[in-house]
Amino acid sequence: MPEGKIVKALSGFYYVQHEEGITQCRGRGVFRKNKITPLVGDQVVFQADNPSEGYVLEVFDRKNELVRPPIANVDQAILVFSAVEPDFNPGLLDRFLVLIEYHNIKPIICISKMDLVDEKMRETVEAYANDYREMGYDVLFTSINTSESIDILKPFLEGCVSVVAGQSGVGKSSMLNVLRPELELKTNDISSHLGRGKHTTRHVELIAIGSGLVADTPGFSSLDFIDIEVEDLTYCFPELKEASQYCKFRGCTHLSEPKCAVKAAVEEGKITEYRYKNYKQFVEEIRERKPRY
């Protein structure tokens, strides 16, 4: 039986990319019986008599899975945040980073609209970028109006399945339109009343860019820490994870425990205060989370 990758899921149909092209498929009833939902990014076995009528027969094991957006087997996440309009938001970026780290996906931070910043804002954004680079993250600067700066991103996409995510209105669809102009993905201006953009992507689809596949993922409604526990959170902050091995107490939450290496690193300036503040805020959110039954 032929194998392929689901590159689009829409209205109960799964579009499977394989050596000979793309075949439109439906899922077998056994998936519903076993409560399995094929996802974009799934590697599958399928059967088809023609390109428009096929059936997905088997879904291979996934290395990771996101719920919102519903996508599997992601190699990396391109987290797009604008320098201005809306202003760069490290708190929201850290929220995305925690979720991506928790799912063992490599994050790449892409700061867009650098062509719109004044000198003061540029210094602020570059200072944040240097902080995140010191934590081990790749940070790229792009300007939506110049294709040359978008080319900076292309080498990072080669041979990978990438998710594009980020704050609404930061230029995710505009970025993909520059990478692949024929896509003509719809973009919306920022709402002056809310200071944020309306989401313009309606479904998840993997798009070929070079030798890579990129998903323009809709929404950011999944930013609640539904599955993450307090003990997981340290491991989603690389610099806290590094320092925590020197804490006196195993299972230290880095809040009130004595001889905490993380708090010491914050006091010494080795961990930024805003990252530690966000960590504490996330701990509080998780502890106040209502239990699920």
UniProtKB/Swiss-Prot annotation:
Record-annotated residues binding GTP? 112-115, 166-174
Q: A Gene Ontology biological process annotation?
A: ribosomal small subunit biogenesis
**What GO terms are given for molecular function?**
GTP binding; GTPase activity; metal ion binding; rRNA binding
Domain CP-type G: from-to ranges: 63-223
For this chain's record, the cofactor binding note is:
Binds 1 zinc ion per subunit.
Q: Which PROSITE patterns match?
A: ENGC_GTPASE (PS50936), G_CP (PS51721)
Q: What is a single cellular component term in the Gene Ontology annotation? A: cytoplasm
Record: residues binding Zn(2+):
247, 252, 254, 260
| SUPFAM superfamilies (alphabetical) | Nucleic acid-binding proteins, P-loop containing nucleoside triphosphate hydrolases
**Could you tell me the EC number(s) of this protein?**
3.6.1.-
* UniProt keyword GTP-binding present: yes
Tell me the InterPro entries matching this sequence: G_CP_dom (IPR030378), NA-bd_OB-fold (IPR012340), P-loop_NTPase (IPR027417), Ribosome_biogen_GTPase_RsgA (IPR004881), RsgA_GTPase_dom (IPR010914), RsgA_N (IPR031944)
Locations listed in the record:
Cytoplasm
Q: Which UniProt keywords apply?
A: Cytoplasm, GTP-binding, Hydrolase, Metal-binding, Nucleotide-binding, Ribosome biogenesis, RNA-binding, rRNA-binding, Zinc
Which domain of life does the protein's organism represent? Bacteria
Q: Which cysteines are joined by disulfide bonds?
A: none
Cofactors:
Zn(2+)
Q: Which Pfam family, just one, is annotated for this protein?
A: RsgA_N
Predominant cellular place of this UniProt entry's protein: cytoplasm
The text of the family note is: Belongs to the TRAFAC class YlqF/YawG GTPase family. RsgA subfamily.
Record's NCBIfam families? Answer: ribosome small subunit-dependent GTPase A
| Assembly description | Monomer. Associates with 30S ribosomal subunit, binds 16S rRNA.
Matching entries from HAMAP family are given as: GTPase_RsgA
UniProt-recorded name of the protein? Small ribosomal subunit biogenesis GTPase RsgA
Write the lineage as a comma-separated list.
Answer: Bacteria, Bacillati, Bacillota, Bacilli, Bacillales
